[in-house]
Amino acid sequence: MCVVVLMTVPGVGVKTAVAFAAAVDNPDRFRRVGDIGPYLGLTPRKYQSGDVDHNGGISKTDCRLTRHILFEAASALLLRHKHDCALRRWAQALIPRIGLRKALVATARKLSTLLLSMWRSGKEFIPR
């Protein structure tokens, strides 16, 4: 049932929905929806020491396949789908500021939080 709900998001197909459901397993194990990003390795690496404060690339912890599939879903949403929705407009607005690759990673992270919240609520995606 959850896979059908997840597939209502533009760019998310059977493969993405099944991989996400398999990686998460139980949506209630995450206290907040925002905790899914670090779990999937879709957050920036941080290095701090004294006055030094560097942000690195994504942390790439666990779930390598799921992270790759979410990246592909973000790519499909941004580059191939013609659905006009708030998520796509948000991602397109990021491209001039941070570049395509970082915008795709940010969209993949946003997709993961969206999919988790949809799975918890059982509500389908409604494009705006």
Specify the residue positions occupied by each region the protein language model found.
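A detector of single, family-specific signature residues
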Residues: 1-128
